[in-house]
Amino acid sequence: MRLPAFLPVLSAALLGAVTASAQTMEFACPDPGTTFTYDSGVKVVARGRSGMDCNMERVGGGPFKLRALLFDNPSADGNDTSAFIAALRPERLWPLEAGKKIEASYKIGGGTWTYTLAVVRYERRTGPGDKMIDTFLIEMNETGDKGQRSISRWWIAPSDKFAIRYDFSDGAGKANRAVVTQITR
């Protein structure tokens, strides 16, 4: 039996359509009860969703809201980040798709900060349990009006509906990271 000549072209077109649709992510929060354990030992538990906020709780700490899977309020050090989140409006990044970018500025303490958040790419990387998983890499470039610079990166896993890794560094030599090492459902 001979296959029609157009079949390879049709197959390639369909495969491309499936791949492209797999590289977007609608906003979603982790399922309630899911526990994320970081390399530092800190654990957070998903509690539900309220609009673009995921309701979360730090084990041994308190509840917080995670806006657009990126920014927590209150922050881990207890600071209210409402004004910062309102200025950035990170929910505009959703649905996630490589190449999408938003910009914002924020004034505080007599200074102005400019932010560019971008969905840099869709990539496979090592995740919890050393498994290869699909992620979206989001970068936030922050510049201050006095030459300050920093970059933050989140790797959001569609399968977990959570950032499985976060990295931060600035022009003053400060750096931080948080890596999810275990997920319990």
Q: Where are the predicted features?
A:
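Short helix-onset patch at the extreme N-terminus, typifying the N->h transition
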Residues: 6-8, 180
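Sec/Tat signal peptide C-region and signal peptidase I cleavage site
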Residues: 18-22
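Positively charged n-region of N-terminal signal peptides that target proteins for export
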Residues: 1-5
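Acidic, serine/threonine-rich low-complexity disordered tracts
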Residues: 23-78, 94-185
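Bacterial N-terminal signal peptides
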Residues: 8-17
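Acidic/charged, solvent-exposed loop-and-adjacent secondary-structure segments enriched in E/D, K/R, S/T
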Residues: 79-88
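Prokaryotic Sec-type signal peptides and long signal-anchor helices
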Residues: 10, 40-42, 88
